[in-house]
Amino acid sequence: MEMEIKALLVDDEEQCVKTLQDGIDWKVLGVAETFGAYNAVQAREIMKEEMISLILCDIEMPGESGLEFISSVREKADLNDENIECIILTCYPDYKFMRKAMQIGCSDYLIKPIDTDEMTAVLEKAVEKIQKKFQKDEKEKKLFPDAMKTSFSEGQQNIIDGKVIPYIQEHFSETLTVTEIA
């Protein structure tokens, strides 16, 4: 099974998003598709529909900052650093922003304007981490194929596979309760 990496580019400057989408050979890097958003609200909408593996995000945006957005995505989805690679793109070489970015699990912090070679190197590293995590997950699935299914009857597993998992995927970026899922 092959991993399809999807990247989400979040910046209130439309030209920045367009430049990133058009100026980088994403396919060569191993990224299948990119999505652009101009604020945190749009970014969340995209994340409801797509399984994003890589986020490149500006800090200063109208409404919610990029740091707040990434922090909330991680909290709501209970994600750790290995699930989604996050990279900050900003004009602010401010230590407190850098520190916060590292605290919320961002893998890098790039200052605009960004050197193409530096950007490519950072993206290659992020894609490699995503691929390694996916390969590790696939190996675990092969080693323990029935680990999750052994405690459920066939009927229960069918409900989980047919209703519960699609519901969770559809509401991935929202806070969910056991009652809502049930």
Predicted feature residues:
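Short hydrophobic/Thr-rich beta-strand motif most characteristic of the beta2 strand and flanking loop
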Residues: V28-Y38, I46, M98
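CheY-like receiver
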Residues: R44-I46, E50-D161
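Short alpha-helical "recognition helix" segments of helix-turn-helix
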Residues: I181-A182
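Two-component/phosphorelay signaling modules centered on CheY-like receiver
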Residues: E14-F35
